[in-house]
From Swiss-Prot:
Record keyword Membrane present: yes
Protein known as: Coatomer subunit zeta
Alphabetized Gene3D superfamilies for the sequence: 3.30.450.60
Family: Belongs to the adaptor complexes small subunit family.
Membrane topology note: Peripheral membrane protein
Quaternary state and interactors: Oligomeric complex that consists of at least the alpha, beta, beta', gamma, delta, epsilon and zeta subunits.
Keyword Cytoplasm: yes
Length: 165
C-alpha cells in the first residue's frame, strides 16, 4: 500500500505543454510524458507507466492527475471532480491566458487540495472558501463609487476643455 493518494497533478494546454506541475514522487520526469499522452488520448481515465491517469478536458486546458495503481480509484475520481469544479470556479473560462492570469490562485488551490500527495480537502466549496479573495485584478476590476466616478468624469472633462484654449 502506498501512502500517496496522488503522485502528481498537472495543468497542461491541449498540446500537452505543462502550465503548472505539482509532483509528489521521485519520478518527476514522467510528468511530461503523462501530459503528452493525455493530450493525444481521448479517454478520461487510462493506465500509463503503471499509474492510473485521470484527465479532464476543459476547453483549451487539461487537468491531469495520476496515482499509484493500488489507490482507491473511486475516491480519487470523486475528489478530482471536486477539484475540477473549484478550478473552474477560479478561472471561469479555462484558457491558457486565464491560467496564467490566475496562476497564484491555482497554486493556492492545489496547496489546499493536496499536501505531499495526500488529499486534504474533498469539497470544491470548502477549497474555494479557504482561498484569499483578491481585491481586484487591474483597473478593470476595481470598484469605483458612483459619486467618485461622476466627479472624476467631470474633472477630466473640465481639464480637457481648459487645455484646448
Amino acid at each position: 500500500m502506498n501512502l500517496f493518494d496522488i503522485e502528481g497533478l498537472l495543468v497542461a494546454d491541449s498540446q500537452g505543454e505543462i502550465l503548472y506541475r505539482r509532483v509528489f514522487s521521485k519520478e518527476e520526469e514522467i510528468a511530461a510524458k503523462i501530459a503528452e499522452k493525455a493530450a493525444g488520448d481521448r479517454e478520461s481515465i487510462s493506465m500509463f507507466y503503471d499509474r492510473i491517469v485521470m484527465c479532464k478536458r476543459l476547453d483549451e486546458v487539461l487537468l491531469i492527475i495520476y496515482s499509484p495503481m493500488d489507490v482507491n480509484e473511486p475516491f480519487v475520481g470523486q475528489v478530482f471532480d471536486e477539484f475540477t469544479a473549484a478550478f473552474i470556479g477560479i478561472v471561469k473560462t479555462p484558457t491558457r491566458e486565464r491560467v496564467w492570469k490566475k496562476y497564484d490562485q491555482i497554486v493556492l488551490l492545489v496547496a489546499e487540495f493536496l499536501y505531499e500527495g495526500i488529499v486534504m480537502s474533498g469539497k470544491s466549496d470548502e477549497m474555494l472558501d479557504k482561498l484569499p479573495k483578491r481585491n481586484f485584478e487591474g483597473v478593470d476590476g476595481m470598484k469605483v463609487p458612483r459619486g467618485f466616478a461622476s466627479f472624476l468624469h467631470k474633472a477630466t472633462k473640465s481639464l480637457s476643455i481648459g487645455s484646448n484654449k
